[in-house]
Amino acid sequence: MKLSISCICKISLSIVATLLLLSQVFNTRFLQDDYIVLGFLSESTWIGWLNAVWLGQGGNLWPYGFHALLLTSSVHTVNTSLVAIWTLFVVAVVTLCNLTIFKWVLGEDIKMLGKLKIMTIFSISYLGFEGLFTPGLISAYSYHLASFSHLWPITLLIFALYQMSIGSRNIFLAFVLGIFIGNSNIAESTTAIICFAIMFILRKKDFFFTKEFYEKSKNFYYAVFSGTIIGFTIIIISPGFWNRAENSVGLPSSASEFVRRFFRSFSSFFADLITHPMFWLSFLIGVLISKPIKSFNDRANLINKIKLLLSLGLILFCSLTIGSTFAYVSWHQSTGLYQIFIPFSFLLGFYSESLFNLKSSKSMKKIILFMVITSLLLLSLRATLAFEKRKTDWDNAFKTNVCLVKNDPKSKLLGAEMLYPGFNLGIEDVSSWEWMRDGYAKWISNPEFISEFKC
């Protein structure tokens, strides 16, 4: 039986994504913020950790709290099982989020994804984060504190909007979603508040479905909006938020410094987005599985839905840019953007014939298929080798570091970094940052820590 180009594309995506995910899960090792949490928990309690975060870091307690819970089973031994399993759970949540987006935008056309619908969405959801210059799969699925702070709030916001669109009346769910969205990170919380505020201001106008969202589920809307504001307020009233704002990087001291930092933030996020390979590959994947629109009304409805996604992405982009202007820019802060722009790009490709009059011949689709598969194989091969190398480096460094700390607690430790070429962005380790080293040393030097290695 001869397979169609669309079917070959879906099968290839599924195989590459599954193998790469297994590699990431089986090569899971602790990284960056994990060390300071493990070090703290080896000497104190989970409640003590939340108190320390409140006083010194900020009021976004649920990301730090959940992250610490993931590590509680690893305080006295090297046990990455729960962290690895959580990676699978996050992949499932992101896949469900994208299924929600596609179900809302595509409607009946979601059947066009065929029998491999779930696997196709899973593949796009998982592979969508891997960058050209940054290990995006790590930031989304293994760097759990970053994921809780930047990816989860946008995922939950999309889920909340979908619940409103179908007229959900579950007030408790709405309020809890709002708390989690608002108490995540300033930029993402601000994005949600702006979206809900626009919805209220335009509640009587059908501007990007504001009237539809509001009228179908008013009580849900008020509950999720209230929860978001409460969660956001908890962040900014904490002593740690202002302590970090003043002492970490510091607020801009002049107009010229503000402008310089603003353009640095803008250029960083913009460059990250346009050089992100899956932003373009998702469009091409959509072209390979494309479907024309039959009626003018369907086209107008589709355009409004895609504009809504774009508007959400632009609001988040602006929030991230302004937020990092007052703080700092880091490579792992873009995960929320990918959660919006990767499905957005796929949808543009899926309806490219109707939206842009882009008609691809069979021979052209074969070329596109070759480009997509080749690009994904190269990206996946690099990521797999990077996962394997970091695991090996981490294990070897751990054996050495246990003995180094026993002999001299202040000795220089070996690290296991995962930096992508170009700008040397990625996972740094105990050999580069003193705060990571201190947490790591406290963790492995704890008298109750169990190590199989003899020095």
Task: Provide a role label for each language-model segment.
Residues 7-21, 121-126, 176, 223-229:
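Alpha-helical transmembrane segments
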